[in-house]
């Protein structure tokens, strides 16, 4: 891969690099910018991660740079790791001394020794991340590429600098990183490297769930996430990190009737949705929307394959999966549960005559997330029949139009009935009890069904009439 030397210089002419150069020469240490920042110069990608390796003490170099940057610089030293960080405004520099590493079989924590630049490049995960640019004045901007990282970028290839079995056994997270880079960059994984991932897949079990989720999130947020999940499936990692997604694979046939491969369908939905949103948790909703289909799959000789209530069962499965995978057990989880629970509703609406009542109930149940729900449901139309797709999308358009009209007229999104439980108890001198709940629910349903408008006077009159049928008399 050719890139003009002037282009390289353009990326390392800023004041921070000049200061690092001066400080390194004063300390008589070699200093290099290495890793992702250099890689992204050649890929013409913006990058804020600036990693500096010093052949000597990275901490001492960081201290010298911080002094030169003055009062605006904030220095953090991590002595146990032999690293330091310098922050000044938006600038963030990471410093480390060149080192060589070795690992024990059951840990990602390396045994670290001082080393040369070559040692440091040897320990890098992939050849494209082992590129280094010298910052010392006499060799300023000189590229050090011992493993053919530039050639691999030219060939769009992810490859390890050393024996991939050693690389992945030493640090199994690198298997996830290989797949993540391939997904983000649109690269291929070198066959020997990919085969080594398959051989070492079980080693992923020593990696913390949090680190795995960090990589999965980056895959989910990539332009075409299906690439990553296909690779995770093909190398055998997927059953270790997300067995419920892996369980969607396969097609079963009975009496000549088959069903679609729900794994392939899920990835197609995810890709389609990714074209319309960068919302991480909405994209995760695509991965979870059919997660209960294996548990609900039944064959009916009259109906064929059914997956009854897979949306409700899926909603109930989510907390256990989130807990196991160390996904957040907070509003984000509840949001995904809502998306999974409701994802069949707009499709049902689009497949039949759309009533005002059904629209009101959808607006009420989905609340502020109704637009996200519609995006998910539109992405869920993956039929190979173009006429069917066209019909569904046209019906979705009508659903959206009707939603807009009803929302403006009835204000039912996130609405609370105009009559509260407290007012019901006060009106009829009731303690907290079933009749209070029955009346409140009846008022809500009357509004959603269009029996009464979403207004206090109408709701109050409806309450009195319904209460009379329940032999309840107001005390005021």
Model region roles, listed by residue range:
Residues 1-476:
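Catalytic cores of the polymerase beta-like nucleotidyltransferase superfamily
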């Amino acid at each position: 891969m050719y890139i003009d030397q002037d282009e390289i210089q353009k990326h390392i002419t800023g004041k921070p690099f000049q200061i690092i150069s001066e400080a390194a020469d004063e300390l008589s240490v070699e200093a290099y910018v290495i890793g992702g920042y250099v890689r992204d110069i050649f890929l013409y990608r913006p990058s804020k991660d600036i990693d500096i390796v010093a052949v000597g003490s990275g901490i001492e170099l960081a201290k010298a740079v911080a002094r030169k940057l003055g009062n605006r610089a904030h220095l953090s030293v991590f002595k146990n790791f032999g690293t330091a960080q310098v922050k000044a405004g938006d600038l963030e520099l990471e410093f480390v001394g060149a080192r060589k590493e070795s690992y024990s079989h059951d840990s990602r924590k390396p045994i670290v020794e001082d080393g040369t630049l070559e040692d440091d490049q040897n320990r890098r995960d992939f050849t494209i991340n082992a590129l280094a640019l010298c910052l010392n004045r006499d060799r300023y901007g000189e590229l050090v590429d011992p493993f053919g990282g530039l050639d691999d970028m030219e060939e769009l290839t992810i490859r390890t600098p050393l024996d991939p079995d050693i690389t992945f056994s030493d640090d199994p997270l690198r298997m996830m990183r290989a797949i993540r880079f391939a997904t983000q960059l649109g690269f291929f994984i070198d066959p020997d490297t990919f085969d080594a991932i398959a051989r070492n897949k079980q080693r992923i079990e020593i990696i913390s769930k949090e680190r795995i989720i960090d990589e999965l999130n980056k895959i989910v947020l990539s332009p075409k996430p299906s690439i990553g999940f296909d690779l995770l499936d093909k190398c055998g990692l997927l059953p270790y990190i997300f067995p419920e997604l892996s369980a969607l694979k396969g097609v079963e046939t009975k009496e000549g009737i088959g069903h679609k491969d729900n794994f392939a369908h899920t990835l197609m939905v995810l890709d389609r949705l990714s074209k319309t949103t960068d919302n991480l948790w909405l994209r995760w909703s695509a991965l979870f929307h059919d997660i209960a289909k294996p548990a609900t799959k039944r064959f009916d000789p009259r109906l064929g394959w059914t997956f009854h209530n897979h949306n409700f069962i899926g909603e109930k499965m989510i907390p256990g999966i989130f807990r196991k995978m160390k996904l957040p057990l907070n509003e984000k989880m509840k949001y995904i549960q809502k998306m999974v629970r409701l994802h069949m509703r707009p499709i049902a609406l689009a497949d039949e005559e759309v009533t005002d009542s059904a629209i009101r109930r959808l607006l009420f149940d989905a609340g502020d997330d109704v637009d996200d729900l519609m995006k998910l449901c539109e992405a869920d139309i993956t039929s190979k029949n173009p006429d069917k797709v066209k019909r569904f999308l046209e019906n979705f358009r009508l659903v959206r139009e009707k939603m807009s009209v009803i929302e403006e007229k009835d204000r039912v999104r996130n609405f609370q009935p105009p009559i509260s439980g407290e007012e019901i108890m006060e009106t009829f001198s009731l303690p907290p009890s079933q009749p209070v709940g029955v009346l409140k629910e009846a008022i809500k349903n009357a509004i959603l069904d269009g029996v009464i408008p979403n207004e206090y006077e109408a709701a109050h009159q409806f309450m009195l009439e319904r209460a009379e049928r329940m032999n309840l008399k107001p005390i005021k």
